[in-house]
């Protein structure tokens, strides 16, 4: 919670604000976006920098060590450094998975740190990043998603508990969507259950997800569940498609069969989510076993 203790929020009502510290210009840091994983939280700050706190056993806080931050006094505020992303520039999108953190930067690159299992960091290996100072700063590694692509949004997820793995998806200026990492449950949308975790599978060899003939429409937003592995893409015309795990009907297509794990499940074969009266989807949020959509009418 970033409040300098492990006392549950029910004992601290009203909940105290998280101290983000002081900006170098003398004013307070403010958050423009926040994202939470299983046991860590990150804030995108008003200058494009990032601060994270919580569990850090895989380096997901990006501080070059594996110590928990935020459970003791004097660890937050000015005591918590911004993550050293070297010369990457401002972050424009923040994706926090089960045990990973990803950022898309103003130059279109993506970097992820934390758990590498499954290949969700996009580096062509499954080693953890962020647990050592040599992983950050000038040595920050960037995901290999292909040439002539510039990311505008990144989302991170994966599965928790037994069989834990990592998944990352990105939306590009071309409106293409690519996913990499653990392929279980079809969350990569590639028509198989294979992990994407080697150099040979990344870069230009990584194909965009086939969403079928969208009639000139295109994805404008993404959401991924951080603990079970399903992904949803919202189109500019308000329609939405989801794929991956579907054990509780979270894909919104009227059954509990996963999608994306077999060759005939994507493209034209992947149905659109049926909303109330086919209302326009404005925003989507995914949880472990459910999906929620804010519709243009204001209904959720």
Predicted regions and their residues:
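Eukaryote-biased RCC1-like beta-propeller repeat architecture
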Residues: 1-300
């Amino acid at each position: 919670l970033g409040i300098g203790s492990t006392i549950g929020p029910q004992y601290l009502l009203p909940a105290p604000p998280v101290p983000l510290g002081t900006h170098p210009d003398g004013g307070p840091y403010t958050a423009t976006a926040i994202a939470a994983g299983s046991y860590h939280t990150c804030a995108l700050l008003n200058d494009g920098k990032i601060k994270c706190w919580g569990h850090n056993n895989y380096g997901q806080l990006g501080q070059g060590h594996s110590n928990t931050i935020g459970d003791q006094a004097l660890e937050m505020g000015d005591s918590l450094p911004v993550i050293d992303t070297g010369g990457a520039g401002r972050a424009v999108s923040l994706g926090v998975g089960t045990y990973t953190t990803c950022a898309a930067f103003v130059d279109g690159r993506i970097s992820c740190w934390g758990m590498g299992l499954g290949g969700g960091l996009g580096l062509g290996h499954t080693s953890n990043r962020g647990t050592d100072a040599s992983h950050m700063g000038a040595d920050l590694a960037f995901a290999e998603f292909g040439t002539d692509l510039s990311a505008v949004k990144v989302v991170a997820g994966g599965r928790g508990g037994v069989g834990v793995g990592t998944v990352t998806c990105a939306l590009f200026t071309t409106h293409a969507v690519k996913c990499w990492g653990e392929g279980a449950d079809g969350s990569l949308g590639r028509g198989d259950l294979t992990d994407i975790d080697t150099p040979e599978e990344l870069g230009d060899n990584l194909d965009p997800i086939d969403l079928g003939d969208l009639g000139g429409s295109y994805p404008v937003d993404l959401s991924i569940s951080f603990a079970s592995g399903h992904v949803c893409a919202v189109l500019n015309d308000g329609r939405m498609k989801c794929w991956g795990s579907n054990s509780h009907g979270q894909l919104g297509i009227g059954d509990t069969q996963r999608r994306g794990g077999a060759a005939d499940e994507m493209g034209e074969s992947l149905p659109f989510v049926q909303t109330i009266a086919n209302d326009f989807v404005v925003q989507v949020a995914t949880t472990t076993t459910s999906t929620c959509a804010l519709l243009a009418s204001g209904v959720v």
